[in-house]
């Protein structure tokens, strides 16, 4: 099954760290939504979207990528890193319009220094850690 993960990793590289580990251990292609905003996904059987959570949603580049590039009727999985909590609502609304089937979701803590967290040196400083990366890799392996 040909699989890609489209990701955005902006502030601390949490999401990129996670998806690069997944790519090392699983047969997936990585697509940076910021650097490759027009990537063609038509040849993939399953597509993952991965992002940190920004203002309770996936990064804007991911949301725009889905709107613009996702072929209808694809199997989708979602991965997020977060300081506060996971939130899939906005991206799931967009995916629903594209008749995509969400086959799984994975989230883990990620180092966060946004807003008031900066005053205390950030939260989730050691995340994603080895356990988070193993869990993410196991999650993707379990989808195949």
What are these regions (language model features)?
Residues 3-6, 10, 16, 21-29, ...:
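FMN-binding flavodoxin-like domain, especially the glycine-rich phosphate-binding loop
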Residues 27-38:
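A short beta-strand-loop structural module common to alpha/beta enzyme folds
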